[in-house]
Amino acid sequence: MVQLDNIVKTYNKGKSNAFEALHGISLTIEDGEMVAIIGTSGAGKSTLLHILACIDGYDSGEYRIDDMTIGKISERKMAAIRNEKIGMVMQDFALIEEFTALDNVMIPLDFAARGKKKRKKDRKEIARKMLEMVQMQDFVDKPVS
């Protein structure tokens, strides 16, 4: 479960051009729940998503993933949380054109498996299932270009 309680984020804090991007944001996202963040340009959507993805910090409030309070843990533990619990697709993403669809999907799986005993065969099966979920199984072995 993901919980935000009264999150505040200010850019250029303490300066004359300070801007409060988020003020008092609270939300709960249950395991398995899908949520869409919508709003006008400049509404704070990207700021909120960067905080949720543990890419950026916040000024006050509390952010919890399961039982862990984010912001009160080490950078090493934060990296582990990003690796195990958080996924984010950027608005402007790029595929490696010379790679197949399967190879592109394998990149984050291979990265996450570094230092762990996860077999490549198992990761490939996960990647294949992911491609099936989005009805791209026919493109598994084709370059994405």
List each model region and its residues.
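Signature (C-motif/LSGGQ) region and adjacent switch/coupling loops
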Residues: A18, S74, L102, E132, ...
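ABC ATPase NBD coupling module
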Residues: F19, I70-G87, K120
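The feature captures the beta-strand-to-loop junction immediately N-terminal to the Walker
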Residues: I38-T40
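Conserved ABC transporter NBD signature motif
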Residues: G61-T69
